[in-house]
Curated annotation (Swiss-Prot):
Belongs to the universal ribosomal protein uS7 family. NCBIfam families: rpsG_bact. Keywords: Ribonucleoprotein, Ribosomal protein, RNA-binding, rRNA-binding, tRNA-binding. Part of the 30S ribosomal subunit. Contacts proteins S9 and S11. It comes from Citrifermentans bemidjiense (strain ATCC BAA-1014 / DSM 16622 / JCM 12645 / Bem) (Geobacter bemidjiensis). It comes from the Bacteria. GO terms for molecular function: rRNA binding; structural constituent of ribosome; tRNA binding. This is Small ribosomal subunit protein uS7. The keyword rRNA-binding applies.
Amino acid sequence: MPRRREVAKRVILPDPKYADRVVAKLINIIMLDGKKSTAEKALYGAMEIAAGKAGEEPVKVLKKCLDNIKPMLEVKSRRVGGSTYQVPVEVRPERRVSLAMRWLVKYSNTRSEKTVTDKLAGEILDAYNNRGSAVKKREDTHKMAEANRAFAHYRW
C-alpha cells in the first residue's frame, strides 16, 4: 500500500425527491449501466408502495428497514501459523450501512415478483417487519461471529 495521504471521501449529494443522502446512496447501488433515472423510478416506486402498506413516511420506512438489516458483527479471516481462523470483528458504522444496502438490493433481486419495483418494495417491507432474506443474512452473519467467539483474541 502506498504511504501517501488518505484519500478523501467523495460527497454524495442528496437525492432530488426526498433530499436524503441514504436514498441517494441506495439509488447509486441499484443503478446499472449508468441508468440513474431508471434506478430512481424503481426505488421511489418501491418506497411509495412500502410506505403505503406500512402506513408511515417513505424515508422512515426505508431507514427502519436498513436498521433491521445492519450487521453489528462480522467475521474476517486471519491466518495464524498454518491455519486460518474466522475472527469476529465489530463492523464500522459506514460499512454497516453499505452492507445493509447491498444485501437489500441483492436479496430483492432474488425475489419472484415481476418488476424491480415490486421486488424492492417486497424486500423493504419484509425487512421493515424483521423478516426476509436480507434480515436472515444479518442473523447468519451474527451467528457466524458468535460461533467463532473463541477466536476473538486474534483481533487486530
